[in-house]
Amino acid sequence: MQPSYDADDFMRRGFFGSFIGFRKRSSSKPEPPVPPKFAPPAAPSVAPNFRASDSAAPHLLSVPSNRTEYDIYREIVSEAEYIERSSPASPDFSCPTTPQPSNYYTPLPLPQQPPTFDPSTLMPQQQMMFHPGQYHMVMSPIAPHPIPVDTNGVPLGTQCPMAPPPYSSFAPQSSSSGMLQQQPQDLVIPQDIPFDVKREIQEHLVLQNGKKQMSIEEIVKLVVVALKDSQIEEGREEEESPEEILRRKRIQNNLAAARYRKRQREARESAESELGDLTRRNDELRDQVSRMEREIDRLKQAVLGRQ
């Protein structure tokens, strides 16, 4: 009698099992199935589309009996949940960056259901090797279809071969180190600084450029110190006489008076131009008012003449 068509036969007779011919390789000799205690042993059935090499041992599938439609439905639902969690688009997707020590894939636990058949009828877990250097297929009673895993035991669907190394392998970089790695920019020195101060600042920047990048606060301090040093050196080298001081003061007063007279002249010219503009505008408004009065008188005469 032909056994019933269940989820196991559906997964093994599918496109994946017929397109790729898997070889079955077991690390140990297959143990004979234990006969069930309460149910008669079912006849072993071999998938017609499953191809095995001549050197491989035959793998007989035991179809559990007394499986209800609810059991098959729960099995399909759990398979769909596993595929959905293994998808990279799901939020539960994990991408390991280090190899796992386990050589077997541990499937997700299924909801607790009352057993409808004897678990002793299940076959022991077998491993199917497609190629020793590539990956092997793990057969599990919970996941009836073969799951491709690599040599480290990680499923191929949940592994990222191009994943970066763990974050702990990178040295932490602070914000200050990131600022120091930036390229130094050209500093703009004001034009009103004396030539000696500019030269000193440039020499200091050239000497410090190979060591570290100077901050704005350090540059300001350097400019202030250089200006003070230049003023002290100028005062020590040249001691002014009273006549020179009086002459310098007169020159400063003359320059200040010239600036004052210039500002007064500009203010007077601005006021005169503004007054001229206002006067011209006033004349224009008066002419406009007179024209409007003449137009009103003409309209009055025209209206009175018609009456």
From Swiss-Prot:
CDD domains attached to this UniProt entry: bZIP_ATF4 (cd14692)
Main location group: nucleus
Cellular localisation: Nucleus
GO biological process: one example: negative regulation of innate immune response
Iron-sulfur listed as a keyword: no
GO CC annotations on file: nucleus
Compositional bias (Basic and acidic residues): 266-286
Domain bZIP: 243-304
Effect after changing residue 167 to A: Mutant protein accumulates in the intestinal nuclei and inhibits the mitochondrial unfolded protein response (mtUPR) on an atfs-1 mutant background, or in response to phenazines
Top-level taxon of origin: Eukaryota
Pro residues composition bias: residue spans: 30-43
An annotated Gene Ontology molecular function: DNA-binding transcription activator activity, RNA polymerase II-specific
Region of interest (Disordered), ranges: 24-51, 259-286
Known function: Transcription factor which negatively modulates activation of the mitochondrial unfolded protein response (mtUPR). Plays a role in response to infection by the Gram-negative bacterium P.aeruginosa.
Family: Belongs to the bZIP family.
Protein name per UniProt: Transcription factor zip-3
Organism per entry: Caenorhabditis elegans
Gene: zip-3
